[in-house]
Amino acid sequence: VPLQELSGWHRHPDYARLRADAIREFAADEGIDLADSDTALVFSAHGTPTHYLEAGSRYDVYVEEYCSVQASLLGVSEYEVGYQNHENRDIPWTEPAVEDLVPELDADRVVVEPVSFLHEQSETLSELDVELREEAEAAGLAFHRVPIPHDDDRIAEVLADLVEPFLADFDPGYHQLRQCQ
């Protein structure tokens, strides 16, 4: 069975829209105005050891690019990006660490969007919902975490759209997605 690599799919416009819709709907349900100066929007991305970046990975660039698109879709000009690192390993990780970033925010509330995750897991349910919430509340911030829209029907549609070129034997460049490094 031939193996095809599909990378860069976070750039698919329908995926970007469905994630922005989830943030917008969550904020509306919580009565939060994302443009309010007392609200800080934080995109929390999975961290990576910096030696991968030094070796040529552009992961941090892709995270920044994706967050910029999300902010634009939301009509928000100010936001922060933090990384969930595994600092129990004695190597340098991407910065800033989200747990260092959040307590320093100049806001009354923080809305955290876990941008690197497609489903709920320990890194969202424990690291964000429990540990980061404790850090935020200790700093006097109301904490809100956007649920991952893993059950949104549009995710399956996006994935099908991305896989179809490979199955139909036409150029995967059809989507004009650049390969990630």
Please tell me what each predicted stretch does:
Residues 1-181:
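Extended amphipathic ligand-handling, pore-lining, and cofactor/metal-binding catalytic surfaces
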